[in-house]
Curated annotation (Swiss-Prot):
Residues 91-105 have a biased composition (Low complexity). It is found in: Secreted. Residues 23-62, 87-132 are annotated as: Disordered. GO terms for cellular component: extracellular region. It comes from the Eukaryota. The keyword Secreted applies. Residues 36-47 have a biased composition (Basic and acidic residues). The lineage of its organism: Eukaryota, Metazoa, Ecdysozoa, Arthropoda, Hexapoda. Keywords: Secreted, Signal. Residues 1-20 form the signal peptide. Residues 51-62 have a biased composition (Polar residues). This is Proline-rich protein sgp2.
Length: 132
């Protein structure tokens, strides 16, 4: 379980690193490119933005794109959606009784000691507390 968590954290960090590359970087990217220039919030003129919200808008759009990519990735990992269609969900387990049924047996120590199926304990001498 610990290794799965480490794997997913590493994968999310790799996706975040790929999606945060500058525009001129031609390295590997998780986002598909079709040759068109993508307009970003930082490309808008100062008439459309007052300058202070420019960087915030760019980071918000990047963050939204990042979470969309994670959601698409996690949706692609769901085997039930692949098998049963887009409206499928994880099947629910049947309702089980909350308390397990135990045999009607007294749980008192006296009853356990009187039970003949339990082997008797050997007599172990008690340690003396006196010093020699």
């Amino acid at each position: 379980m610990k290794y799965c968590f480490v794997f997913f954290v590493t994968l999310i960090c790799l996706i975040a690193n790929c999606s945060a590359r500058p525009e001129g970087d031609k390295g590997l990217s998780a986002a598909p490119t079709d040759g068109k220039q993508i307009e970003r919030a930082s490309d808008k003129t100062s008439e459309e933005n007052d300058g202070n919200t420019n960087a915030q808008g760019d980071s918000n759009s990047r963050l939204q794109d990042f979470f969309k990519q994670i959601k698409q990735f996690l949706d692609s990992l769901n085997p039930f959606k692949k098998l049963l269609g887009s409206g499928a969900s994880v099947p629910q387990l049947p309702d089980l009784p909350t308390t397990p049924s135990l045999p009607d047996m007294p749980l008192k120590p006296e009853a356990i000691l009187q039970n003949p199926s339990v082997p008797s304990l050997p007599n172990i001498p008690k340690p003396s507390l006196g010093l020699p």
